[in-house]
Amino acid sequence: MRNLSLVANDAVAEHELPSPLDFWHWSGEVYGARSQDWLQVQELGGCVNLALLLHRLDQCGIPVDLTDLQPALVQTEAVLTPWRALRKSAKARVGEQEYQAMLAHELELERLQQGVLLQTLRELSLYRGKSHNLLNYLSLLGAQQGPLRDLIC
């Protein structure tokens, strides 16, 4: 049984988690540096935003149960996935300006998804510890040996 004072010291305060804006900017930098690698997560049926969040939590030493984030993922993917499919199928049929507007809307949906994931995270009781969030997620997707393996903490 853990000492209660140790548990209190290991607890992650809400202010220690990234704000939606900070996470959006951090994600843009990390994703932009290796977009093709991160897109492999999506190609395997995963969520890039979730993978980025799990990577960030690994960097901070904050383990999380993937099932705790599942409701947020289901809620946001229900909107994002069909929109992404519509945008891709419309690319050949719409003008460049319309396509860019669709892409901009998709980015707003991505940002919304990040916000919902972060809000869900803030509702959890989180503790510092050994964290293998990204490895666990990539393993579920069958991608633990893929191009992102060097990011696993």
Regions found by a protein language model. Name each.
Residues M1-V7, R34, P82:
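Intrinsic low-complexity, intrinsically disordered or marginally ordered coil/linker segments
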Residues P20-E43:
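Short amphipathic alpha-helical segments and their helix-coil junctions
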Residues S35-Q70:
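N-terminal interaction modules that seed assembly of large macromolecular complexes
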Residues L39, L54, R87-K88, L118-R122:
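Amphipathic alpha-helical segments within well-ordered protein domains
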Residues C60-L117:
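Structured binding/interaction patches within domain cores
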Residues A92-C153:
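A charged, amphipathic interaction segment
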